[in-house]
């Protein structure tokens, strides 16, 4: 019976010492997150398209929040995202990179001409949001609800059977973005 109490005491002491060491290590080696990075990342559209030159929205948010990158590189977000970033970071709004269509982007989705698709899966590998389904040597198709219109699947296609088509605005997909409407507080 005594050996049972010794074992319980030894394991309890070991657990207590391990907890103290892990607690100290967690505090000592804690990585502090920059709250500005989190706020910038929340504003970005999270399409992970790479059109800004970064592999995703989080790396672009880190580059913008450190002050080294321009706020006008997010093509899917358009002018709305750029204005929100300018307000958050207290910098001057900048014209968007690209042509005039970048200021007011039109939602587009990928369309695969299935008759010409050879099933090489290069578009599936390029899609950052897994919006393309299919198998090797079989037809592929795009799930338009998941497609962000990033255009990354078009270039790898060896048969040029993928094109970006604009999505018609209907009552089912139209969203009134109330955050873009300027609101002024009137004095009493």
UniProtKB/Swiss-Prot annotation:
Entry superkingdom: Bacteria
Reported function: Part of a membrane-bound complex that couples electron transfer with translocation of ions across the membrane.
Binding site for [4Fe-4S] cluster 1: 49, 52, 57, 74
A GO MF label: electron transfer activity
Start and end residues of each 4Fe-4S ferredoxin-type domain: 108-137, 138-167
4Fe-4S domain boundaries: 32-91
Protein's cellular compartments: Cell inner membrane
Gene this protein is translated from: rnfB
Protein name per UniProt: Ion-translocating oxidoreductase complex subunit B
Natural source organism: Yersinia pestis
Cofactor needs: [4Fe-4S] cluster
InterPro entries, per the entry: 4Fe-4S_dom, 4Fe4S_Fe-S-bd, 4Fe4S_Fe_S_CS, Elect_transpt_cplx_RnfB/RsxB, RnfB/RsxB_Proteobac, RnfB_subfamily
Pfam families associated with the record: Fer4_21, FeS
């Amino acid at each position: 019976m005594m050996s049972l109490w010794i074992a319980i005491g030894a394991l309890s002491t070991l657990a207590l010492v391990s907890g103290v060491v892990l607690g100290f290590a967690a505090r000592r080696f804690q990585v502090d997150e920059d709250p500005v990075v989190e706020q910038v990342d929340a504003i970005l559209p999270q399409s992970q398209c790479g059109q800004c030159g970064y592999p995703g929205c989080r790396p672009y948010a880190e580059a913008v929040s450190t002050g080294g990158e321009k706020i006008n590189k997010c093509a899917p977000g358009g002018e709305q995202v750029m204005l929100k970033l300018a307000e958050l970071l207290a910098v001057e709004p900048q014209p968007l990179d690209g042509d005039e269509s970048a200021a007011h982007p039109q939602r587009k989705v990928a369309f695969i001409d299935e008759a010409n698709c050879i099933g090489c899966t290069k578009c599936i590998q390029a899609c950052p949001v897994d919006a393309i389904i299919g198998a090797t040597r079989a037809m592929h198709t795009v799930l338009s609800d998941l497609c962000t219109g990033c255009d990354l699947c078009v270039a790898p296609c060896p048969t040029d059977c993928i094109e970006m088509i604009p999505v018609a605005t209907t009552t089912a997909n139209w969203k009134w973005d109330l955050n873009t409407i300027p609101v002024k507080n009137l004095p009493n």
